[in-house]
Curated annotation (Swiss-Prot):
InterPro entries: Elong-fact-P_C, NA-bd_OB-fold, Rib_uL2_dom2, Transl_elong_fac_P/YeiP, Transl_elong_KOW-like, Transl_elong_P/YeiP_cen, Transl_elong_P/YeiP_CS, Transl_elongation_fac_P. Keywords: Cytoplasm, Elongation factor, Hydroxylation, Protein biosynthesis. The keyword Cytoplasm applies. It comes from Francisella philomiragia subsp. philomiragia (strain ATCC 25017 / CCUG 19701 / FSC 153 / O#319-036). Gene3D superfamilies: 2.30.30.30, Nucleic acid-binding proteins. This is Elongation factor P. GO terms for molecular function: translation elongation factor activity. Pathway: Protein biosynthesis; polypeptide chain elongation. Belongs to the elongation factor P family. It is found in: Cytoplasm. Signal peptide: none annotated. One of its GO terms (cellular component) is cytoplasm. Pfam families: EFP, EFP_N, Elong-fact-P_C.
């Protein structure tokens, strides 16, 4: 198995700590006036999204995580797992509801998502930054009603709820930022 020295640490590097795949979020090299240099590293656990801080002595090496990222198309839900298919190899990946997490509310048939595999098993799904979804339910916007916050809740075809401007109506397709769960714009046909 490959390993990385602390000299090679940088943001985005995937390493194995106590059997858990981690990604380096921040790396700070510290050389005190007295004593040995060290790296203060902020790590994000890929299995549960927890962020931890850890220090490594300069020159120490850690094992590389067997993490692979690939794009796959969402096909269908089969009762207990979501099925994604690689567009070129047609290999299917069964993804559990735990691994899917918050991405579930952005799932749309035949859209492409990024799958993160650890030892060949899907551990996380990343939705595209923006998705186009249909509004299935929202209150009608009353003309001249601008006294409030300037928005109203709208339920989308996937079940997600986002705040939209008053002029947006049921049946319209809108663009949503999946990172912040916010309305971006209406989609023109």
């Amino acid at each position: 198995m490959a390993s990385y020295s602390t000299n090679e640490f940088k943001g985005g590097l995937k390493i194995l700590i106590d059997g858990n795949p981690m990604v380096i979020v921040e790396n700070e090299f510290v050389k005190p006036g007295k004593g040995q240099a060290f790296n203060r590293v902020k790590l994000k656990n890929l299995l549960n999204d927890r962020v931890v801080e850890k220090t490594f002595k300069s020159g120490e090496s850690v094992e590389a995580a067997d993490v692979e990222e690939l794009n796959a198309v969402y096909s269908y839900f089969d009762g207990d797992s979501y099925v994604f298919m690689h567009p070129e190899t047609f290999e299917q990946y069964m993804v559990s509801q735990e691994a899917l997490g918050e991405t579930k509310k952005w799932l749309k048939d035949q859209d492409e998502y990024q799958i993160i595999l650890f030892n060949g098993q899907p551990i996380s799904i990343i939705a595209p930054n923006f998705v186009n979804l249909e509004i299935v339910e929202t209150d009608p916007g009353l003309k001249g009603d601008t006294a409030g916050t300037g928005g109203k809740p709208a339920t989308l075809s996937t079940g997600a709820v986002v705040r939209v401007p008053l002029f947006v109506q049921t049946g319209e397709i809108i663009k949503v930022d999946t990172r912040t769960s916010t309305y971006v714009s209406r989609v023109k046909d």
